[in-house]
């Protein structure tokens, strides 16, 4: 496999024939090869094994945006921009850091922390910055000038209700339309939730397989005990035993309901968001 063929190349390590060196060869940060090399060397410390880490930011002891993204479960949206930011850091430049979530830990000296306020916060200035948000619009204006790297948290849950036999494309259209109405990125979806009567619904399963996200299902009893104000339907209650599926499923997953029931072509969706923080 050529590295360019995969957005997230796998971690590749090489151990020399004497067992002296464990070399992180490919995907040191995103693939975790650097960490794995250190772990293996630690296990073989009594044999004198030494980890060999060659990524520039590690050699210089600088902040690494791709390692930071990996540790926080964030999606890198632009690898070229990530390279530009890493190169700038190695040259001693300061990078602006906008984050829509609480920040824990000490912010590295290479970053200038700003509270994200969209365009009003200067995202259209010609400067390099890292932006953490699940919103689509935040990167759009900034991308026109300078280098704005958006890191996407996977913190969105979509609750789904549908007729039996609904195909994947109809599921996708309904989910996409709802997320776009909220200016949310599809890449931010952490999972899909529904009632257990839908646990074998092929359209939903196919959508989840494509997105590589979990499909969480709950019994009518589990959904019924959820607290909140939900859009009730007598018809849905007769069929499923609970007055609402999509909204209650979101809440059952542990997410806060962000947008209530929306119907499109026989598919109902609701959108929720997990609370999270960013850790340095």
Outline where the language-model segments fall.
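C-terminal non-catalytic interaction/assembly regions of soluble proteins
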Residues: 188-247, 254-257, 263-267
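Generic structural signal for short, solvent-exposed loop/turn connectors between secondary structure elements
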Residues: 2-6, 250-257
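N-terminal basic/disordered segments at the start of proteins
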Residues: 260, 265-280
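Alpha-helical scaffold segments in soluble metabolic enzymes
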Residues: 35, 39-43, 206, 247-251
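Stable alpha-helical structural segments in soluble proteins, enriched in small hydrophobic residues
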Residues: 174, 178, 245-252
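Conserved mixed alpha/beta catalytic, RNA-binding, or beta-rich assembly cores of soluble enzyme
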Residues: 2-77, 81-199, 272-278
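Aromatic-enriched hydrophobic runs in primary sequence
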Residues: 1, 150, 177, 207, ...
């Amino acid at each position: 496999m050529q590295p360019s063929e995969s957005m997230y190349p796998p971690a590749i390590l090489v151990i020399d024939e004497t067992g002296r060196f464990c070399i992180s060869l490919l995907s040191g940060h995103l693939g975790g090869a650097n960490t794995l090399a250190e772990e293996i060397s630690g296990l073989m410390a009594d044999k004198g094994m030494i980890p060999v880490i060659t990524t520039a930011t590690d050699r210089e002891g600088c902040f690494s945006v791709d390692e930071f993204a990996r540790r926080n479960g964030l999606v890198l949206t632009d690898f070229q921009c990530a390279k530009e930011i890493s190169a700038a850091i190695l040259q001693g430049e300061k990078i602006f850091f906008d984050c829509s979530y609480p920040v824990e830990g000490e912010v590295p000296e290479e970053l200038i922390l700003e509270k994200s306020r969209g365009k009003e916060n200067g995202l259209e200035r010609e400067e390099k910055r890292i932006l953490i948000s699940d919103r689509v619009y935040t990167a759009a204006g900034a991308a026109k000038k300078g280098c704005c790297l958006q890191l996407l948290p996977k913190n969105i849950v979509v609750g789904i209700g549908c007729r039996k036999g609904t195909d994947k494309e109809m599921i996708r259209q309904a989910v996409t339309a709802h997320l776009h109405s909220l200016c949310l990125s599809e890449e931010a979806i952490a999972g899909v939730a529904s009632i257990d009567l839908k646990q074998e619904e092929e359209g939903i399963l196919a959508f989840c397989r494509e997105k590589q996200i979990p499909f969480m299902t709950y019994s009518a009893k589990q959904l019924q005990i959820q607290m909140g104000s939900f859009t009730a339907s007598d018809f849905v209650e007769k069929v499923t035993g609970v007055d609402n599926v999509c909204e209650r499923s979101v809440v059952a997953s542990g997410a806060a309901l962000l947008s209530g029931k929306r119907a499109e072509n026989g598919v109902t969706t609701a959108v929720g968001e997990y609370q999270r923080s960013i850790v340095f």
